[in-house]
Amino acid sequence: MNQLCVERSPNISTATAYIKGKPKKSIERIKKKKDSNKSIKSQHKFEGSKISNKNNELKDVKSKDPKNYESYLNKNTKHKDILLKSKRSDNFKFSRRGFILSFTGNLEDFYNLSEEPLGKGTYGCVYKATDKLLKIQRAVKVVSKKKLKNIPRFRQEIDIMKNLDHPNVIKLLETFEDEEQIYLIMDLCTGGELFDKIIKKGSFVEMYASFIMKQIFSVLNYLHIRNICHRDIKPENFLFYDKSTESLIKIIDFGLAAYFNDIDYEMKTKAGTPYYVAPQVLTGCYDYKCDLWSAGVLFYIILCGYPPFYGESDHEILSMVKKGKYNFKGKEWNNISDEAKDLIKRCLTIDSGKRINASEALKHPWFKKKKGSFNLDVKMDIHVLENFKNYALLLKLQKLAMTIIAQQSNDYDLQQLKAVFLYLDEDGKGNITKNQLKKGLENSGLKLPQNFDVLLDQIDSDGSGRIDYTEFLAAALDRKHLSKKLIYCAFRVFDVDNDGEITTAELAHVTFFVILFLHHVNDFPRLENCTKYIDLNA
């Protein structure tokens, strides 16, 4: 049975327990009696209200969901807990977000930073960093707290990055914090900025432009489905993962990104870069389609080499943007297809209500004509199906470890799986349906086992109904990629105090937070101050 409990320290009279899909329950601390090392099933059910009685015992406690949950009283030398045990063994779900841990202390105990920064920003610099033990190279964004005008706003940037899981989004791996700085440890991209490539080449042929723009519209579709507006789409904020011709691009810098709600899309903060900013942003009342305007400007630039709106100063540029007038008159446009020009027009529509959205852009005839790829071999072989089967048989703790390994793996080792995932993601939502995966396997000539639907449920580790990028990688990852370095990465996530050993409490630390993040619980103690115990054998 799955088991979740919350420790109450001696100076706290109440604690919070969490049940999957249910609101938090307040429980009064049960005072210690005799210490024991065993867990005893109580004679009563969990009520969810404060527990109080003369004998300090668990009495008259009822379950809110008696069909699925029982309550237990746990006693040992350090604490006493209410245990919430699920009667079902198949509902243990977890999210990769919970593995992106935050640490306090000296970053240089773990990483060697390059002397020269890779890039500079308003609040800090990005350096190349090398893991001292594993020799893995990462990128570290170093942000000065003194220069940050709004630290909560910066923490929202971190929160947004933790929630994103897409092949075209820069991957946040962990964070550090000391008294003066905040450090974001991310994937290292070595291929340079999209901006630099535009400067070097001048313009792109349509086939390559379609390869780039499909990725941009796909990642915008992914963000907008999750009610996130980037608000600073420009070529400087896209990096090539490596220097290869077919390298994917990664969107970076979520410093201006913001959440919007389903009822009122409007945002009011003026944000963006003059060449790429949408007219509505200048008025201080705009919606998520400001990103589509910016994408349209970027699209225009990569086809001809210069922006649609220009001037000698920011004031002149913004004046041109407000008018929204541009043309395709230069000789550079002579050989550009009408379909490409039409897609640009749909992005650069002044009326945001009539402006195309990212999902519609992906279905535009231009992509069908150009196919938007380099004919990558995306067929899955029998080994992928076998890896799925093997993953489904793993213990829950092993699945947690495989998810960490998939997240920590660099894209060099995952090129084929990444191409397969993007191919299967037909609607550009950044995740795939179970039917899309089945169709892809069948189209590759593979015979599916009779219990394949059950197997798919095992791959969908967060229970969302769709298979996310890291979920797919964790299940499809070939065991030959399980290097000692990656295995140690998984070990280090669980080894909270970095003493080279993993205790039951440390396993519970990580697993508890993975569960909390899955259910979007924000009201919980700091990691270093709480100990959670979970039935890890379940």
From Swiss-Prot:
Cofactor(s) annotated in UniProt: Mg(2+)
Residues that, per the record, bind ATP: L118, G119, K120, G121, T122, Y123, G124, C125, V126, K141
Matches recorded under InterPro entries: CDPK_Ser/Thr_kinases, EF-hand-dom_pair, EF_Hand_1_Ca_BS, EF_hand_dom, Kinase-like_dom_sf, Prot_kinase_dom, Protein_kinase_ATP_BS, Ser/Thr_kinase_AS
Short motif (J domain autoinhibitory motif): ranges: 387-395
Gene: CDPK3
Location within or outside the cell: Cytoplasm
Region described as J domain: 387-422
Protein name in the entry: Calcium-dependent protein kinase 3
Domain Protein kinase: start-end pairs: 112-367
The entry's keywords: ATP-binding, Calcium, Cytoplasm, Developmental protein, Differentiation, Kinase, Magnesium, Metal-binding, Nucleotide-binding, Repeat, Serine/threonine-protein kinase, Transferase
EC number: 2.7.11.1
Biased composition (Basic and acidic residues): 56-68
Presence of keyword Methyltransferase: no
Family: Belongs to the protein kinase superfamily. Ser/Thr protein kinase family. CDPK subfamily.
Record motif J domain EF-hand interaction motif, residues: 396-405
Annotated region described as Disordered, given as residue ranges: 23-70
CC per GO annotation: cytoplasm
Keyword Nucleotide-binding attributed: yes
Limits of the EF-hand domain: 412-447, 450-481, 482-517
Annotated catalysed reactions: L-seryl-[protein] + ATP = O-phospho-L-seryl-[protein] + ADP + H(+); L-threonyl-[protein] + ATP = O-phospho-L-threonyl-[protein] + ADP + H(+)
